[in-house]
Amino acid sequence: MKKNPIKPRDTEFLTVAPFPCFNYRVYIIFTDSVEKTANSLVSQGLLKNPHEVDDATRAFTVKMPNQSFVVLVYPYDVDISELTHEAYHAVCCMFKWIGASHEEELLSYILGYLCKIVADDRKAMAKKLEKTT
């Protein structure tokens, strides 16, 4: 198992969606502030500065060139369109990593699988958040 490259802030929930058949991982961060998370990722060397993430940004994807992972950052209250939009970026990054062409059916299955993982992780995060408040 590879070491986790991300150190989450105290107000972040970090999960991972592994794709072992592609030697690829999608890290998922749910946060109270996407802007603070962006700054944290800059300090960890995972995001370039300036990063263009501000208080109007709802969610974003950190694309890691020549790396076997991508990072999705979502607010606690992410909606399905934001969830799917960023997950699509992650799947496209994974396809580039494995050298696959944009094959519609395969991409659709993997996107659906990843969105289900993110949605399930969001529900689990919401339950944890409920217990702490």
Question: Residues of each region from the PLM?
Answer:
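Generic hydrophobic, helix-prone segments enriched in Leu/Val/Ile
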Residues: 28, 41, 90-95, 110, ...
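Short N-terminal micro-motifs specific to bacterial/archaeal maturation
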Residues: 74, 98-99
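Active-site recognition of the HExxH zinc-binding catalytic motif
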Residues: 81-93
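Post-HExxH zinc-binding segment in Zn-dependent metallohydrolases
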Residues: 99-133
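N-terminal low-structure segments adjacent to metalloprotease catalytic domains
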Residues: 1-30, 67, 96-97, 113, ...
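Short, solvent-exposed coil/turn linker segments
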Residues: 30-33, 83
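Active-site scaffold of zinc-dependent metalloenzymes
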Residues: 35-78, 90
